[in-house]
């Protein structure tokens, strides 16, 4: 993402309620609402330093990998609902997410029947993230909380 500091300040910076996922989407949506044009260059590439960005943590430990996947899953759904609620209103966000919630509940039941504990756990955490956002509670789950579930 490239923008100048003046534009960043006019838009109001990043929404500090969003910990992970949708922070750029939210910023661009607010910029558009203020009349700024948004351009996406698909050919642009960046190189991240080794393991510094949260999403590229280097680990070979299976438990750590699963916990990170669960953490990402929780924050993704929390942030997505928060974004929709913020920009389209609570009612439309609920309508949009109702089929998603039904699908999550279905998958929890499916993986419980199949005895796939890892996927059942992931979808339970995803449901928890969605419900937390629906209840207007902050994005507060971290790796320690994921480990304890």
Question: What are the functions of these language-model segments?
Answer:
Residues 5, 19-22, 76, 103, ...:
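Residue-level recognition of hydrophobic positions within alpha-helical transmembrane segments
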Residues 22-23, 61, 95, 145:
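Residue-level detector of alpha-helical recognition elements and their boundaries
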Residues 1-47:
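A short, conserved alpha-helix in the catalytic core of glycosyltransferases
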Residues 18-21, 66, 70-73, 120:
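Flexible, glycine- and charge-enriched loops at secondary-structure boundaries
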Residues 27-30, 79, 83, 129:
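Generic recognition of well-ordered alpha-helical segments
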Residues 37-115:
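Active-site-adjacent helix/loop segment of glycosyltransferases
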Residues 94-149:
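Terminal low-complexity segments of carbohydrate-biosynthetic enzymes
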Residues 12-13, 51, 129:
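Glycine-centered flexibility sites
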């Amino acid at each position: 993402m490239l923008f100048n500091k003046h534009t960043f300040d006019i838009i109001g910076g990043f929404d500090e309620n969003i910990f992970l996922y949708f922070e750029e989407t939210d910023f661009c949506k607010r910029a558009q609402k203020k009349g700024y044009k948004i351009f996406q260059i698909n050919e642009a590439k960046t190189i991240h330093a080794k393991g510094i960005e949260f999403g590229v943590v280097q680990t070979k430990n299976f438990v750590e990998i699963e916990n990170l996947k669960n953490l990402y899953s929780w924050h993704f759904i929390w942030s997505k609902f928060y974004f929709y609620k913020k920009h389209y209103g609570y009612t439309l966000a609920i309508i949009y997410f109702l089929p998603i919630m039904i699908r999550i509940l279905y998958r929890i039941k499916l993986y419980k029947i199949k005895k796939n504990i890892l996927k059942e756990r992931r979808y339970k955490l995803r449901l928890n993230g969605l419900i937390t956002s629906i209840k207007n509670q902050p994005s507060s789950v971290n790796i320690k909380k994921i480990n304890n579930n």
